[in-house]
């Protein structure tokens, strides 16, 4: 009997050691994996919208299709139609892939934006506009629609911060700094990659390997807040009346600084 109890105790002790070793090893693997990722955290699991706040009443228009976040610009939410993370961030670098699926709406009022952020004028002082097949979305930073890194098809290119560029109360140097240095977008339907860095009140945007915004000052930007994917566009009598957010997103990662 004593021998049997000793054997049972020994087996239990060995089992305990094996479990402890497994837990310890698993912890090491997790740590090493985290270290290998360099501190990057995934904001999208490729399967569902866990970690995101879907607008109330959306009706399934923000959805996951084939491993990407897909939006058809038709959210039925009565209020905000944007998609937000359920976590707030302060200083960070955000990486994500995005693409414009199609551009069924032709925007007849697209201005030609100059390097200082102003619009090109004709001899009468009127803004020169052109017609462009357009789609419009963007990345909201720190919970602020004004601090939006734009996604669209305008000739100036994606990456600009529209809310600051168009704010006439901002100093000229601020408005110029949030205007893209170059057009770096790929063709409509192709994937693009943003790397967006926010540190204090300063923003840098790299689009497809090109720095389009470098250390732009965003006076008054919130100290922290969630990341948002923008809704834009609406229909009238079944036809698009403004540039729709016909966009997709994938490979969304963030590293806090």
Predicted regions and their residues:
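Carbohydrate-interacting regions of secretory-pathway proteins
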Residues: 29-257
């Amino acid at each position: 009997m004593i021998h049997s109890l000793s054997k049972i105790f020994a087996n239990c002790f060995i089992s305990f050691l094996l479990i402890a070793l497994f837990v310890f090893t698993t912890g090491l693997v997790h740590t090493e994996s985290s270290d290998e990722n360099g501190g990057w955290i995934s904001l999208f699991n490729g399967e569902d919208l866990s970690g995101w706040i879907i607008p109330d009443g959306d009706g399934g228009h923000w959805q996951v299709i084939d491993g990407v976040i897909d939006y058809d610009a038709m959210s039925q939410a009565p209020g905000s139609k944007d998609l937000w993370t359920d976590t707030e961030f302060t200083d960070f670098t955000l990486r994500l892939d995005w693409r414009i699926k199609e551009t069924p709406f032709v925007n007849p009022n697209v201005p030609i934006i100059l390097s200082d952020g102003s619009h090109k004028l004709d001899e009468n002082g009127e803004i020169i506009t052109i017609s462009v097949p357009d789609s419009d979305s963007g990345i909201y930073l720190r919970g602020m629609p004004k601090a939006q890194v734009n996604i669209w098809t305008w000739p100036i290119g994606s990456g600009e911060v529209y809310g600051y560029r168009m704010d006439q109360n901002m100093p000229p140097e601020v408005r110029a700094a949030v205007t893209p240095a170059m057009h770096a977008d790929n063709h409509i339907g192709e994937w693009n990659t943003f790397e967006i860095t926010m540190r204090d009140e300063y923003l840098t945007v790299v689009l497809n390997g090109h720095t389009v915004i470098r250390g732009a000052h965003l006076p008054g930007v919130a100290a922290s807040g969630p990341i948002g994917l923008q809704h834009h566009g609406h229909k009238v009598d079944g036809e698009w009346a403004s540039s729709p957010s016909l966009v997709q997103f994938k490979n969304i990662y963030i590293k806090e600084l």
